[in-house]
Curated annotation (Swiss-Prot):
Protein's recorded name: Ribosome biogenesis protein wdr12
Organism: Salmo salar (Atlantic salmon)
WD repeat residues: 99-136, 138-180, 187-226, 255-293, 295-334, 340-380, 384-422
Any Gene Ontology CC annotation: nucleolus
Region Disordered, annotated ranges: 221-244
Keywords per UniProt: Nucleus, Repeat, Ribosome biogenesis, rRNA processing, WD repeat
Function: Component of the PeBoW complex, which is required for maturation of 28S and 5.8S ribosomal RNAs and formation of the 60S ribosome.
Any single biological process term in GO: maturation of 5.8S rRNA from tricistronic rRNA transcript (SSU-rRNA, 5.8S rRNA, LSU-rRNA)
Family matches, as HAMAP family: WDR12 (MF_03029)
Region Ubiquitin-like (UBL) domain, annotated ranges: 4-87
Subunit details: Component of the PeBoW complex, composed of bop1, pes1 and wdr12. The complex is held together by bop1, which interacts with pes1 via its N-terminal domain and with wdr12 via a high-affinity interaction between the seven-bladed beta-propeller domains of the 2 proteins. The PeBoW complex associates with the 66S pre-ribosome. Interacts (via UBL domain) with mdn1 (via VWFA/MIDAS domain).
Taxonomic lineage: Eukaryota, Metazoa, Chordata, Craniata, Vertebrata
Gene Ontology MF, one: ribonucleoprotein complex binding
Amino acid sequence: MSQLQTRFFTDNKKYSVDDVPFSIPAASEVQELSNVINKLLEAKNGSRSQIEFDFLVQGQFLRTSLSNHMEAEGISTEDVVEIEYVERFTAPQPEECMMHDDWISSVEADSEWILTGSYDKTAKIWSLEGKAVMTVAGHTDVVKDVAWVKRDGLTSLLLTASLDQTILLWEWNSERNKLKARHCCRGHAGSVDTIATDPTRTKFCSGSWDKMLKIWSAVATEEEEEEEEPPSRPRKKQKTEQLGLTRTPLMTLSGHNEAVSSVLWLDSEEICSASWDHTIRLWDAETGSVKTSLTGSKVFNHISYSPLCRRLASGSTDRHVRLWDPRSKDGSLVLLSLTSHSGWVTAVKWAPSHEHQLVSGSLDNLVKLWDTRSCKAPLYDVSAHEDKVLCVDWTDSRLMLSGGADNKLYTYRYTACETDAGA
């Protein structure tokens, strides 16, 4: 078929065209369609424009000719083809580069500050402009994960988790730039590799090489708690005096058969964890019982949850990013696989304000930006790092971040959410 009957539509009122059928060549690709829309806009508005657009047919981005796409997707050419168009997403633009003295294991940023953890045994607080504001030194071994707890005016609470089997709860005053360790959380019998603060900002959960998850209070108090010695393995001897008052867990969640690699809260009552035992588990935060188990075929390195699309993204040792419905009754059903990395996927993070987009980092040195409506290839490869990518983040203020084995943390500005949200 040489011609197709099409109808174009968009959510962005600024670029809307008349809702009537058009006859266009079946061999048209993205550039030709973009030219068509620009000509229609010129005729409608009287102003010449050259906007780059992307096109979706039945919810999937067009990456080939219309006829090839429709044949591959099994779409009838007899009916009028509904084609959605959006302004093309621009590539993430590198902004700042920050350095640690060793690998950067973790990053969590918000609208004001960036928090990083490193194999140099420290965490650091940075301004969004890349200025080192505070070095958080207190662990005797590698810092594996970091998390903000809450901000109350000029005072912030933050967490650092370490290979030294402890988690430190810190209080930082940004005006005076003073830092104090409030609590040393003890109870794990292995490296603490992952931490996550709950939505109420009063508790946090940790996951460890010892296969356990533990829930702790995130409220700073003046009380010392009696430490319980791990029954199975003796704790490492302390080389230095402990920072902060001892804190013990509120609850231990036992069920994984290998190391816990990633943990998050779906809401204030549900915890989700990923493990080297090839499972992702949902836990009841009140009772500590397992509610659901999702089974994969490889080690899980990292997970991220989007409340917008209610999907879980996972990164594994077989180079695939996979999407799951965490509340599915069929615990092994993968909704979508995103395949482009050539190494282990070490980190994944959903866009906080875009239900279709996520970012991934890998041992192949690349950060990839994905849109789930274009699952055959990423939107962009970001190749800033010279070594393994170990962590990624994406903030509400549309800042993307990545850290890696080149000791560097990069920030990138990405504005897709603005152009895709409508006028």
